């Protein structure tokens, strides 16, 4: 019997927190269940994982489990009075100080961002829907002009395609989540924002410390990771192209 090489990975979240729904996913061809650790607590994820395993074992289906790490991402923080609307041409400030957000400024999660950007840098917010251009940096404040405006709500992602940001490859949360993966017998780790082979090796070392042979999928989400993959096969035998974040930073034709 020929087995198809293309596999179907389904993300299990609150929308499928029913045994009947998981059973339908498995019966219609799901090969791997992805658990996104950018969201939810360990207690929530464990309840979902146990439900999945119970259904999988009842059906006797060979469906793998993937823990997708949050990784070293940058986000805006919260707006005090809910979403705001940014207009093209207006000024807007990103700050590394912890302040209530409003229509003129908002805090960011990365404490050193003001040290790593400068005038002319593009800053893309909310998967590129909002585009800012840095005009100047004063202290902890990054003064920008809005080049592409629109509605903006709390906790949206930030991408900076023109600068290599010096974020750590593994956060404290990632380390806790990797331990969770070991304790609960996950088959794969999808390692977010891998930029170098060393990023993969650091995860491998941590897993080795726990005597785990969980396999690693290197997720390429920015141009640096893509270029490193071209130079260094040590980035891993398994690669996932995260078209959301990658698509924000480079053209789809590339």
Predicted features along the sequence, with ranges:
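Non-catalytic helical/linker scaffolds that mediate oligomerization, partner binding
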Residues: 1-254
């Amino acid at each position: 019997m020929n087995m198809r090489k293309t596999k179907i990975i389904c993300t299990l979240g609150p929308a499928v927190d029913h045994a009947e729904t998981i059973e339908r996913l498995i019966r219609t061809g799901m090969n791997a269940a992805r658990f996104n650790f950018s969201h939810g607590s360990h207690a929530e994820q464990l309840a979902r994982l146990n439900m999945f395993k119970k259904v999988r074992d009842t059906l006797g289906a060979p469906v793998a489990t993937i823990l997708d790490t949050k990784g070293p991402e940058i986000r805006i923080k919260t707006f005090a009075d809910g979403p705001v609307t940014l207009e093209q041409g207006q000024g807007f400030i990103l700050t590394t100080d912890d302040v209530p957000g409003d229509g003129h400024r908002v805090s960011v999660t990365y404490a050193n961002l003001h040290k790593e950007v400068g005038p002319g840098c593009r800053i893309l917010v909310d998967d590129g829907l909002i585009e800012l251009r840095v005009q100047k940096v004063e202290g902890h404040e990054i003064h920008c002009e809005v080049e592409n405006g629109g509605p903006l709500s709390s906790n949206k992602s930030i991408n900076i395609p023109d600068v290599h940001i010096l974020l750590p490859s593994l956060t404290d949360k990632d380390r806790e989540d990797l331990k969770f993966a070991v304790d609960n017998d996950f088959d794969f780790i999808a390692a977010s924002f891998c930029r170098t082979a060393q990023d993969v090796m650091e995860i491998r070392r941590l897993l080795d410390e726990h005597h785990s042979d969980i396999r690693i999928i290197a997720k390429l989400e920015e141009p640096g990771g893509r270029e490193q993959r071209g130079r260094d096969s040590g980035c891993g035998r398994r690669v996932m192209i995260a078209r959301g974040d990658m698509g924000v930073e480079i053209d789809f034709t590339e």
